[in-house]
Amino acid sequence: MIDIIVKEDKRLITVQTPEGDEVFYTLSFSDEHKLLKRSSARLRNNIYAIGVANIRWVLVDMDNMILSEYMHHVDILKDIDRKMRQLGYIVISEWQHANKKGTRR
């Protein structure tokens, strides 16, 4: 499992890995739960990612062109999402947030 450092600053959550990855989430609260919406990420090798419709991560370059050749980096983001869930956060999708009852995570 991936090692991470989590910094909570009001509504912004910053997650860092020893390898130099940096992932950003927006924090909100619902019924005492900490809900995270995917925002953006800066990964090793200067690869960037954005949360699309808050359902998945998409890798982009500096001009927001989608990078398919680096899709293995998405596994890093999925590992970080999984680790955040283990720490008690709920990484939500837009659908789940809108319905407040969703089961997609």
Swiss-Prot record:
Keywords, alphabetical: Early protein
UniProt record similarity statement: Belongs to the phi29likevirus gp16.8 family.
Superkingdom classification of source: Viruses
Gene source species: Bacillus phage phi15
Protein name per the record: Gene product 16.8
